[in-house]
């Protein structure tokens, strides 16, 4: 709030506000019996309680007519003019309209700061050396006033004219008011003239609390914890203060690792709704090798989580090879990738085969089923596992039409049909060979040899020979 503190017994000349008045303009004998106080379009109470209204021209309005005429003041009947001796001079009261620097920052619609200059000089002085003196006070609009511009409070006492001003109460913290409204009043007052008989002893105005509370640089405002706008507790500083060495991700990076790939739901839905045999079509079901693959279950859709196998410990294989000494079909010089695990003599011709083999030692299973959350070390194992959930059986037997989910199962089943075929082909050729061996001279010997020398059905042949003999 722009409020100036009045000092005791400080005469101030009006030479800084207007031009010097001629000495012969107002003779002493023509002075009015009482001092004239001029407030255009104003309203004064007994003790100068209130002042409402401001002239729209924004200039200094001072009535200094020298003719003797009754005062035509639009004041209420409760106002009693202050009687003064004849030797008193005029009272010059002016009004200044100053536009604020920032019109939008003020709370008041008029945007005007009033500065009232009032004072009475006591004592008789010659007209030639008499100067119009006054004490300058500045009053700013009080936000607590009921009028449009506020209240200016003044009190007149003894002939010494001790102006006593009580500092106004601090204004409430309005949201629209800013610190730009409360400026130093010394910027609006003109410096004292060097030709005046008295000097201006100006003191800085008292400091009043600003509507904006001062922010301590060492304190940080507490903000409510909204989980939708702030990170998780593991990413927040537990002490609430952000230091210069704060990292963007204080949590361990293991929790931010990309999750392993899952089986697409579209793959599961397609084969579940289509039935167990939906994936089997025409020659693909009866042809050799693998049948049609699941859409999205190939190597393009299922990828392993990136990892470094050198950082994982290599453990020995729990189940060793069934035939460890069996030679490989590929020569050793064509298998340049040996297994680094201790006690494992496997060698591979391609690096991807070695990578897939190392997962056996490390136990890394980057492929996960989306239905049962089971992990697998190889993508083809995951593909065949998904078929247990969907019921897909793309591999059918060529002999009986039985369907299988895996090609090795169908291959194992096909061997059964091959063995049965071999037995059927060998069964019709046995009776002709037996008949040719039995035919010839000496039927009894042939019959004895049939019964006694039968290696396959010896007891059965002896029983039949006994029954045939009389």
Curated annotation (Swiss-Prot):
Zinc finger extent (C2H2-type): 337-361, 367-389, 395-417
Free-text disruption phenotype from the record: Failure to promote expression of the Hoxb3 reporter in rhombomere r5 in the hindbrain. Changed morphology of the sciatic nerves, with a higher density of Schwann cells, and a reduction in major components of compacted myelin, including lipidic components, as well as myelin proteins Mpz and Mbp. Schwann cells in the sciatic nerves exhibit increased expression of Scip, reduced expression of Mpz, elevated mitotic activity and increased apoptosis at postnatal day P12. Total absence of myelin along the axons of sciatic nerves at postnatal day P15.
Post-translational modification comment from the UniProt entry: Ubiquitinated by WWP2 leading to proteasomal degradation.
Pfam families linked to this entry: DUF3446, zf-C2H2
Region Disordered: start-end pairs: 126-153, 159-178, 185-210, 275-345, 408-470
Subcellular location(s) per record: Nucleus
Domain of life where this protein originates: Eukaryota
Compositional bias segments (type: Gly residues): 275-291, 440-450
Induction info: Activated during G0/G1 transition in cultured cells.
UniProt keywords, alphabetically: Acetylation, Activator, DNA-binding, Metal-binding, Nucleus, Repeat, Transcription, Transcription regulation, Transferase, Ubl conjugation, Ubl conjugation pathway, Zinc, Zinc-finger
One GO cellular component term: nucleoplasm
The keyword Acetylation is assigned to this record: yes
Outcome following mutation: residue 377 to A: Inhibits interaction with SFN
PROSITE patterns the UniProt entry points to: ZINC_FINGER_C2H2_1 (PS00028), ZINC_FINGER_C2H2_2 (PS50157)
Assigned EC number: 2.3.2.-
Keyword Signal: no
Family according to the record: Belongs to the EGR C2H2-type zinc-finger protein family.
Subunit structure: Interacts with HCFC1. Interacts with WWP2. Interacts with UBC9. Interacts with CITED1. Interacts (via phosphorylated form) with SFN.
Protein's name in the database: E3 SUMO-protein ligase EGR2
